[in-house]
């Protein structure tokens, strides 16, 4: 007897479900900013019960300890989206506190103490800090600094911060900076910069300078990048060779710079990088001078592998995840945030020498039975302009119910935010809420999404509100024409940039019967007028310079 013979037939969309609205509303506990310090693992845990406060946890052996008790909130708002709010070295933690923007130090076992003891040291600062690295030789931090004291947009620099709170500007003049990285011998500093109107996934520059004994920079020169090349994730190997990720070949691939020439380590139609929305992300690290542990995205799914620098070959590393973030490497141990269709995002440690995997923290601890979970299928389908779009298709799934013979499920289309972002197939209760009730769900990676190469990402250039909408509409039509869903019961939802896609699909197209826009964009001119510095020229890429295309902004705004 098959399992289907135990199921009852019922109207798709109205099946009783074990996943309640309360479970969805409770959400997942945020996990972020993983750090390995020797054998110790650190991570940020978001606490909804404490107004969303981010606290730093450390696991040492079997003991988990909170390193930043209330009211400390480990967070920064550099570029508004933050990230990169902490540094750990030899048991000492340095972090940015959200309430006052100040940097604090917590020695192993001690309470956090603010850096600097001078006049006014007990007050909040107008400067924000992110992406710290430790300059061991000079006992100082090097960080991205964003000063909000003046009128207009803030001023961004790379600065050195002493333990006494003193500051020295090292690099200035650019609109934005990220990823200052000092070489193991302390003699060179690399960093990223970019200027308006570019976003960091459009064009960035990787710079390198000498650092003298006193800590001053000289001989700064461009290593890679430009207005049409996006460079990210510069890191030094243990032996002092600069590595980075660039999309100069059409995909974000790994490169190394030996001081004279650039070399692509593993040319591949895969993404070893993601858009720089926030600081502190990592997709590779060094096991040794000749071995790089890396994660990359291929066909919308993350892989984990060991890359041989000498041969350029990738050796897969067994793991259960299809989305991997915040990869950290310390010798033969790695830590990462991982998720999969039946695994909500979790923090895991993998011992590369034994293959043993240990889960250190879970974002959701009370999951439904696996029989209630819809496992998505990767799919591609034709859309406007002779293109193909990508998506994850979730069929209806319920352990106790099935569609009546000949009945077709309603379809919910999801448009992700960004818009330069990506939908993953990691388990989300907000999706399973619908599939367990008899809905099909199509989570669309429309043209402009990351994870599919530069050309796919650039498909949205000048086309926001058009290409993304076309791809959602085409996805629903594709499934309807194949008889997989009920063409008379199509709905769409999305948040932020995905909210604009949703509103445009409802306003300018037929087909969807209903939709939900969560904190969505409806007025593109209003968005442009109110954007913060980081995104203040984003619409020039997504639509056009406003002064040249005021009518276009109005045409694509659902509010009009």
What are these regions (language model features)?
Residues 27-37, 73-93, 120-141, 174-189, ...:
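Conserved beta-propeller blade repeats
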Residues 60-62, 107-110, 162-165, 211-215, ...:
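Short loop/turn segments that connect beta-strands within beta-propeller blades
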Residues 149, 197, 363-488, 495, ...:
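Cap/lid segment of the alpha/beta-hydrolase catalytic domain
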